[in-house]
C-alpha cells in the first residue's frame, strides 16, 4: 500500500473527504465466526435474492462505521485503516480499531450508500455516481432515487482487471481505474447524467 500511495498522503489530507467503511461485528460473535457468518449471509443474499444492497448483515447485528481518511495523522494510520476496511479472517489477520475487532465494510453492503449524506428536504438531491465492480441484472446505467439522493449506477463493460482480494498486483489498479473512467465517460457521452 505504501507503493500505491506513492508519497501522496499529503494530497489525500488536502482532498475532499474520503470516507472508508468498516464493519463492526455483532456483539455476540467473535471476528472469525463473524466473517464466516457475514460471508454466508452476504452470498446467500447476493446469489439468491440478487440484491444490489444487502440488508441481512445489519439484521443479524453487523453495523457500518465510516472514518474519514483525512482523520489519519500519518501515512501508517491510513494504511492501517485501509487494511482494517478489508479485513476478512482467516484470509487476513484479525484487525482491531479502538480495541474492537473490525472487518471488511463490504460484509454489510459492498456499495456503501449508507455512508452518504442526503440533501436537506427541499434542496436539490445530492448526485452520486456509483461505479460497480460486477454486473447485476440491471441496464448498463440506471438511477435509484432515495430521499435527498439521486444515485446513478454504472456497471462495468467487462470484468474489472483486479480482484477485490488482490493486494499483490498493484500494477492492475491503474487499468481498473482507467476502465471505470472509460465506462463513466461513455455514460456521460450517452447523456446518462442529464
Located regions from the model:
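Patatin-like phospholipase
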Residues: 1-194
Amino acid at each position: 500500500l505504501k507503493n500505491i500511495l506513492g508519497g501522496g498522503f499529503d494530497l489525500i489530507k488536502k482532498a475532499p473527504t474520503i470516507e472508508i467503511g468498516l464493519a463492526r461485528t455483532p456483539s455476540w460473535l467473535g471476528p472469525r465466526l463473524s466473517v464466516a457468518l457475514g460471508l454466508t449471509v452476504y452470498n446467500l443474499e447476493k446469489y439468491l435474492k440478487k440484491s444490489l444492497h444487502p440488508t441481512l448483515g445489519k439484521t443479524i447485528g453487523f453495523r457500518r462505521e465510516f472514518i474519514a481518511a483525512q482523520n489519519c495523522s500519518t501515512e501508517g494510520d491510513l494504511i492501517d485503516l485501509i487494511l482494517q476496511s478489508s479485513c476478512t479472517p482467516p484470509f487476513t489477520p484479525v484487525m482491531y480499531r479502538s480495541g474492537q475487532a473490525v472487518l471488511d465494510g463490504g460484509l454489510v453492503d459492498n456499495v456503501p450508500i449508507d455512508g452518504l449524506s442526503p440533501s436537506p428536504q427541499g434542496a436539490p438531491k445530492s448526485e452520486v455516481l456509483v461505479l460497480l465492480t460486477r454486473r447485476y441484472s440491471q441496464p448498463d446505467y440506471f438511477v435509484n432515487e432515495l430521499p435527498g439522493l439521486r444515485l446513478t449506477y454504472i456497471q462495468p463493460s467487462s470484468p474489472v482487471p483486479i480482484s477485490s482480494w488482490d493486494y499483490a498486483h498493484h500494477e492492475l489498479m491503474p487499468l481498473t481505474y482507467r476502465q471505470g473512467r472509460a465506462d463513466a465517460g461513455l455514460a456521460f457521452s450517452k447523456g446518462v447524467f442529464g
